[in-house]
Amino acid sequence: MKNKLDLSLYLVATKGNKSEECFLNTLENAIKGGVSIIQLREKELNAREFYKLGLKVQKLCKSYKIPFLINDRVDIALALDADGVHLGQEDLEAKLARKLLGDEKIIGLSLKKLEQLEFIQGVNYLGCGAIKATPTKESSLLSLELLSQICDKSPIGVVAIGGIDKEALVELKGINLSGVAVVRAIMDAKDAFLAAKELKRKIYENLSLK
């Protein structure tokens, strides 16, 4: 699967205050609108709750034949036999995650410094940001200049993340990205299908999709 990875519209999904039914409906509508990959990110759930929710999201992703990744938790990814995992700089090292998960799984890594490109062995794609201020990353922004430098020097695909909406996509034009990752632009939208569809249109208009 990793050789055919479509990162164009990457959804980082968190259940939040939604009911499980509403959450799953939102994801399904987002997939129908053009989401190409889903990462389940649940910082507040315990391992059992995360696993149970993961089973349902995984089933949905399988039915639409899109990759399903787990945020941070290599153990949950292994238990689910998920398509892969996305790791932060403070999580298990990517090379160790690769040993545990095997060669066919997808591993993504958060990165925001050029020097971190030296340590991406075993990684399939990079997530870089935040591009815009978000509730959790108000003071941790990545400049567009640095994002562009990372994209130009990275041997693997780069996804921009952090406060990205359809307006922000125009600012990313000309940067050698493989896609964008969104959270609120879809998860908080009144209509996830239309939100995803419009984002996808803007992505194709503005990004080269390396």
UniProtKB/Swiss-Prot annotation:
Binds 1 Mg(2+) ion per subunit. One of its GO terms (molecular function) is magnesium ion binding. GO terms for cellular component: cytoplasm. It comes from the Bacteria. 2-[(2R,5Z)-2-carboxy-4-methylthiazol-5(2H)-ylidene]ethyl phosphate binds at T134, P135, T136, G163. The keyword Lipid metabolism does not apply. Its cofactor is Mg(2+). Pfam families: TMP-TENI (PF02581). CDD domains: TMP_TenI. Pathway: Cofactor biosynthesis; thiamine diphosphate biosynthesis; thiamine phosphate from 4-amino-2-methyl-5-diphosphomethylpyrimidine and 4-methyl-5-(2-phosphoethyl)-thiazole: step 1/1. The keyword Magnesium applies. Its EC number is 2.5.1.3. 4-amino-2-methyl-5-(diphosphooxymethyl)pyrimidine binds at Q39, L40, R41, E42, K43, N71, S110, K137. It catalyses: 2-[(2R,5Z)-2-carboxy-4-methylthiazol-5(2H)-ylidene]ethyl phosphate + 4-amino-2-methyl-5-(diphosphooxymethyl)pyrimidine + 2 H(+) = thiamine phosphate + CO2 + diphosphate; 2-(2-carboxy-4-methylthiazol-5-yl)ethyl phosphate + 4-amino-2-methyl-5-(diphosphooxymethyl)pyrimidine + 2 H(+) = thiamine phosphate + CO2 + diphosphate; 4-methyl-5-(2-phosphooxyethyl)-thiazole + 4-amino-2-methyl-5-(diphosphooxymethyl)pyrimidine + H(+) = thiamine phosphate + diphosphate. Mg(2+) binds at D72, D91. Condenses 4-methyl-5-(beta-hydroxyethyl)thiazole monophosphate (THZ-P) and 2-methyl-4-amino-5-hydroxymethyl pyrimidine pyrophosphate (HMP-PP) to form thiamine monophosphate (TMP). Belongs to the thiamine-phosphate synthase family. This is Thiamine-phosphate synthase. It comes from Campylobacter jejuni (strain RM1221). The lineage of its organism: Bacteria, Pseudomonadati, Campylobacterota, Epsilonproteobacteria, Campylobacterales.
